[in-house]
Regions:
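A conserved beta-turn-beta hairpin within the catalytic core of GNAT-like acetyltransferases
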Residues: 61-69, 79, 98, 143
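Alpha-helix C-terminal capping segments
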Residues: 6, 47-48, 88-96
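Short amphipathic alpha-helix that is part of the acyltransferase structural core
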Residues: 1-31, 157, 161-165, 169, ...
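A conserved beta-strand-loop-helix scaffold within acyl/acetyltransferase catalytic domains
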Residues: 23-73
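Conserved acetyl-CoA-binding loop-helix of GNAT-fold acetyltransferases
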Residues: 74, 80-94, 118
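A short, internal acetyl-CoA/4′-phosphopantetheine-binding micro-motif in the GNAT/acyltransferase core
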Residues: 72-79, 106-108
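Terminal substrate-recognition subdomain of acyl/acetyltransferases
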Residues: 100-185
Length: 185
């Protein structure tokens, strides 16, 4: 299994995958994704084994010991075959010098049994890979109730401070205030 960097010519096709793989309200607009790649705020790569099988978009500012997994998906034809776990191991190895942070749907906010079960399944998937839910944090990100998960811990910073430092370069202060609400308690 290998990775290859996403190049500028692939931004539109990548975004087509993102529209298929994520709910509309979890997607940044295309211009924002493109801008963040162009400004080197985002790092993106495909997981490949003779054919692209999935992708990840990461925010990893050089001056921080954190990285945010913004988007992570396995293409539909490769799901439920163990590739997601393998791809996540690649991400963990690639960013082994950092604490990785991600958001997952909050199971307690699910409105149906099906969405609850799906949210629980995703949280358990990340827990098997070594992530844990930060229990003292609740988040509403782009209107979605999320849990914040990390594969490490920093006693000196709150989840809100960590997420602020990761999202601010990508969104700017105005958008951060509009779309991100993280409560540490």
């Amino acid at each position: 299994m290998e990775t290859r960097n996403i190049n500028k010519e692939e931004y539109k096709s990548l975004y087509s995958h993102m529209k298929r793989d994520f709910p509309h309200n979890e997607l940044q607009p295309f211009f924002s994704v493109k801008r963040n790649f162009d400004k080197n705020i985002y790092e993106g790569f495909y997981f490949t084994e003779n054919v692209d099988m999935g992708y990840a978009i990461i925010t990893a500012p050089e001056n921080l010991k954190y990285a945010l997994i913004n988007y992570f998906a396995v293409f539909p034809e490769f799901r439920e075959k163990g590739y997601g776990s393998e791809f996540l191991k690649i991400i963990l190895n690639r960013y082994s010098d950092r604490i990785l942070v991600l958001e997952a749907d909050d199971p307690s906010a699910a409105k149906t049994t099906a969405t609850h079960d799906e949210a629980v399944r995703r949280v358990k998937f990340y827990e098997r890979a070594g992530f844990h839910v930060i229990p003292t944090t609740r988040a509403k990100i782009f209107g979605m109730n999320m849990v914040i998960m990390a594969n490490g811990q920093d006693e000196n910073l709150s989840a809100k401070e960590i997420m602020h430092s990761l999202y601010l370069p990508a969104l700017g202060a105005k958008q951060w205030l509009r779309f991100i609400d993280i409560i540490d308690f």
